């Protein structure tokens, strides 16, 4: 079993519809509206997360292991910012509602 297979098995990840692997480990709802959630999300090989816009909740992405992950964010002002997440650099990025990434 290789390292990726071990991670998938140990974290009990399932294929994500947008690509990659994931598992929700926490989620709560109040009055039918999602307030917060936490997921594990892993991209490997040629997988990617397609550009999408956040509605309602902030997302915080953390880098735990592997090669650099570039996250391109289009802010509310239309400005493009690229975050380079890696073990030796920026290890998290906060993306707020209304932003595309």
Language-model regions: role of each:
Residues 1-93:
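Non-catalytic, conserved peripheral segments adjacent to functional cores
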Residues 99-101:
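Surface-exposed interaction patches
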